[in-house]
Regions:
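Short amphipathic
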Residues: 2-12
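C-terminal structural segments of small proteins and small subunits
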Residues: 57-92
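Signature of N-terminal electron-transfer/Fe-S-associated modules in redox systems
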Residues: 2, 31-35, 75-80
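Compact, glycine-rich, soluble single-domain proteins
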Residues: 11-52
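Residue-level recognition of specific faces of alpha-helices
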Residues: 7, 27, 53-56, 77-80
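Beta-strand secondary-structure signal
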Residues: 5-7, 38, 64-68
Length: 92
């Protein structure tokens, strides 16, 4: 099983709040079966499929998070998730 990891900065003004977390979870759900996503900040981690878990990380603008994706196609899945974060979750 392959595992890929990247560190990305939170760029949207409100950080990893409810709407941003929901967009991340929806993106994880669209990745398909067989992939596992974890998000870590400051030694705390959350399942990529958990809105509440992501919000509890308390990631604010300027913070960095580590995204780890494991499973078949993890490299492409990670690129999609990192792109979402770098795009500020589509927020202004």
């Amino acid at each position: 099983m392959s595992e890929h990891r990247d560190t990305v900065e939170i760029v949207n003004n409100r950080g990893l709040h409810a709407r941003a977390s929901a967009k991340f979870v929806n993106a994880v759900a669209k990745l398909g079966d067989g992939l596992h996503v974890r998000v870590e900040k400051d030694g705390n981690d959350a399942e990529g499929a958990s809105i509440l878990g992501l919000m509890m990380l308390g990631a604010a603008k300027g913070d960095t998070i580590d995204i780890t994706v494991s499973g078949e196609g993890a490299d492409l899945a990670l690129l999609k998730l990192v792109g979402l974060v770098k795009d500020g979750f589509g927020e202004d």
